[in-house]
Amino acid sequence: MRLRRLVLPALLLLIIIAAAFWYFWPHSSNPNALWNIISKKCVPNQRSTGKPDPCAQVDEQHGFVVLKDLNGPLQYLLMPSARITGMESPALLEPETPNFFNQAWNARHFLADKYGKPIDDSNISLAINSQYGRSQNQLHIHISCLLPQVKTTLAREGAQMGYNWQELPEKLLGHTYLARKVTPAELNEKGAFRILAQGVPDADKKMGHFGMAMVSLPGGDFLLLASERDLLKLNNASTEEIQDHSCAVLDPVPR
């Protein structure tokens, strides 16, 4: 009887956690939608007509495409032109794989082009969700505006970070994040994925559990962020949460 009294509450708790996690899990009727756009439209159109439609850019030589996301007036996605599912892909840790974070940062000009005026780098962020916090099975880096409240927090906390991974002193949107500064040269040489895999214990064995983000810092360095999936805390490591696709941080707000 005592065992039953212990087991039943524990089982009920697990059911509640599983139900809550399912509720927060991103769902998609077609998880291959992005890959279909790349492989059946953007790349073939670029090859046959020289126009990347519906993508904004196709660069097969450097292994990426850029697509305007339907969510938000300025959000763009940078994606591999080849099939790479996401954070869990071993290819991301290979030195010959394109430096997608570097490419995504270089593609931020699409936001300003769409907005019609320059956008300060402090308002821009990159984010890629974990294997468990995404709805699409093609790697895609969100290039979008930073949430105003997150911008304020990172402006305050970012200066305290060093060039090794450590826990961000203040949670972002209730979630714990790891953070570290990175120079443009290091980002260009190693890429964000290998910096995470080589710098956080055992991260290379469970890369799919992590979501990553990046913002710029005064002086030219970047701040890399990483969030790890935590079932008990209902955190699916969807780092896109730090972004605001409405771009309320801009004045005037785009429409």
What are these regions (language model features)?
Residues 5-9, 17-255:
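HIT superfamily nucleotide-processing domains
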Residues 1-3:
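N-terminal Lys/Arg-rich, disordered targeting/topogenic segments
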